[in-house]
């Protein structure tokens, strides 16, 4: 089945309270997708943002982002007032997330909502510790991660948000008596973090259910690694490579290459794959099972790391001292499929890959990715549309690429533009510089979008900002850039009927239109 979808982060949805969330705009966007004949809504990870505001550096591999809880829904439930919302600052630019402001304002109102919820529960049942049945059901179903997460966040607050490796030894080393005493003294704070996750879950499941009813599947994204400053690292112990003192022995990154003489030092703890194998990959089974309760499809970031990964001594200042190690390969995916059935996974297989990585992708039968912005460097490039395969997913660009408009105007080299212009029939086959310069940005963008849609690949995912024709202001993430990422938000009213009709028409030409779209009024 040929289908198409749109990449649109929840954070990028419009709304009055600083960041996109699970409110009206999310449901309206589902309506837009359905009207546009789209069957996939691709998201960035829904986990809490961490270092650099990145959803790929989260404090938890299981928790949801508190920022996405819809405040207007809490107001309707009587947990917040209009005055509560008006009292906070939500930033000055509705087209950009101000994470510094958001950190203060969002948690301030969520704490008010929690206090009101506790009072509401006490008033209904005459008992301060009697909560709704669905709350108890949620905490029971998620206790394998929720208890540790709530305790970890309460400890983070008590330690002024310091990295857990800087906590006092009893807490850092998870001394049972110390943790029990802390939990008893901080029951309300721990309860707050559980409450936020409960509301996140209830609200997100409402959005997901609505999307599925409209024929739209949710494509989620899970990073291969966890953050060093995370509850997963704090409680993981033997899951990771540790030295004699219980600290991380080696960390993740990339080797030196043409773009970086020192390589990339990511700093994520590395898995002890031998230990994971002994457990039957139990942690990974839990992680993927949890993700499949949130999403319908999963994109796994840095798929190559399951074959071979770059391991760097934790004390190293650069990635130069690392070396290649073997990952679990098909052994992991066989274990996952044995436990969970056929896996709806899309593998992020971008970059230069060893033959063994390509073999792993083939053995797994997971679809890989092709990115058009990488296609026009010259020669018989594997990303050129005529080299695509049916079992694949095509993107004009990913969240790490700039927009098509900005790529054409500012990022693409003259060689890339000339190659693309000729390939896309925008110029003669051997264009002059003048002929390439005469190509309008809008024409180039449309041609690139149509090249993606016309690919033999089963699926095409187009970022929302490329349908809108936006420039550098919508560039979500520049790898290696510290700060200023993940901030783009769409203008209110972006999802018009006219644009939906245009997208539906473009996709229908290439037999990618959801047949049910014509029945959506």
PLM features per residue range, with description:
Residues 1-11, 27:
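N-terminal regions that are enriched for targeting/export leaders
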Residues 9, 53-197, 226-461, 465-467, ...:
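Alpha-amylase-like alpha-glycosidases and glucanotransferases acting on alpha-linked glucans and related
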Residues 24-31, 202-210, 284-286, 379, ...:
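Short alpha-helical segments and helix-capping/turn motifs at coil-helix boundaries
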Residues 24-49, 294-295:
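Catalytic domains of carbohydrate-active enzymes, especially glycoside hydrolases
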Residues 34, 204-212, 337, 361-362:
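Surface-exposed amphipathic alpha-helices with a cationic face
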Residues 44, 217-219, 223, 297, ...:
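Outer-envelope exported proteins of Gram-negative bacteria
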Residues 193-226:
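Conserved, well-ordered alpha-helix/loop/beta-strand core segments that scaffold catalytic motifs
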Residues 469-519:
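Structured C-terminal cap/extension of enzyme domains
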């Amino acid at each position: 089945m040929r289908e198409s979808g749109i990449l649109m982060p929840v954070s990028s949805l419009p709304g009055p309270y600083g960041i996109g969330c699970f409110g009206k705009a999310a449901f309206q966007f589902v309506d837009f997708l359905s009207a546009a004949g789209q069957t996939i809504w691709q998201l960035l990870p829904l986990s809490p943002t961490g270092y650099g505001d990145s959803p790929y550096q989260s404090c938890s591999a299981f928790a949801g982002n508190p920022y996405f809880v819809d405040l207007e829904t809490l107001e309707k439930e009587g947990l917040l007032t209009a005055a509560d919302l008006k009292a906070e600052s939500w930033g000055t630019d509705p087209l950009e997330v101000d994470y510094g402001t958001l950190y203060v304002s969002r948690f301030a109102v969520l704490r008010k909502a929690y206090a009101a919820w506790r009072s509401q529960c006490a008033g209904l049942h005459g008992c301060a510790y009697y909560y709704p049945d669905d709350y108890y059901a949620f905490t029971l179903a998620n206790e394998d991660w929720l208890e540790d997460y709530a305790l970890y966040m309460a400890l983070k607050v008590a330690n002024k948000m310091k990295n857990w490796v800087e906590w006092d030894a009893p807490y850092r080393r998870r001394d049972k008596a110390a943790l029990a005493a802390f939990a008893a003294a901080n029951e309300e704070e721990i309860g707050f973090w559980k409450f936020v996750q409960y509301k996140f879950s209830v609200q997100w499941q409402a959005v997901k259910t609505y999307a599925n009813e409209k024929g739209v599947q949710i494509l989620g994204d899970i990073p291969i690694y966890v953050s060093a400053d995370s509850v997963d690292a704090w409680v993981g112990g033997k899951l990771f490579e540790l030295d004699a003192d219980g600290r991380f022995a080696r960390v993740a990154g990339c080797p030196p290459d043409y773009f970086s003489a020192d390589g990339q030092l990511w700093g994520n703890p590395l898995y002890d794959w031998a230990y994971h194998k002994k457990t039957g990959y139990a942690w990974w089974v839990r992680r993927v099972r949890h993700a499949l309760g949130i999403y319908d499809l999963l994109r796994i970031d840095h798929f190559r790391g399951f074959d071979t990964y770059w391991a760097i001594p934790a004390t190293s200042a650069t990635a130069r001292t690392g070396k290649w190690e073997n990952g679990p390969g098909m052994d992991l995916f066989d274990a996952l499929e044995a436990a969970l059935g056929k896996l709806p996974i899309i593998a992020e297989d971008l970059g230069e890959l060893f033959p063994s990585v390509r073999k792993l992708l083939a053995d797994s039968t997971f679809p890989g990715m092709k990115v058009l912005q990488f296609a026009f460097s010259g020669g018989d490039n594997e990303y050129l549309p005529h080299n695509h395969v049916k079992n694949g997913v095509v993107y004009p660009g990913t969240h790490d690429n700039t927009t098509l408009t900005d790529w054409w105007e500012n990022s693409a080299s003259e060689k890339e533009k000339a190659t693309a212009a000729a390939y896309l029939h925008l110029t003669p086959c051997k264009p002059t510089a003048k002929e390439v310069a005469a190509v309008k940005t809008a024409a180039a963008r449309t041609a690139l979008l149509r090249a993606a849609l016309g690919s033999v690949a089963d699926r095409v995912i187009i970022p929302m900002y490329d349908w809108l024709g936006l420039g550098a202001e919508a560039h979500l993430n520049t790898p290696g850039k510290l700060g200023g990422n993940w901030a783009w938000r769409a203008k209110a009213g972006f999802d018009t009927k006219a644009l939906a009709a245009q997208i539906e028409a473009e996709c229908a030409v290439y037999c990618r239109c959801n047949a049910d779209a014509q029945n959506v009024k």
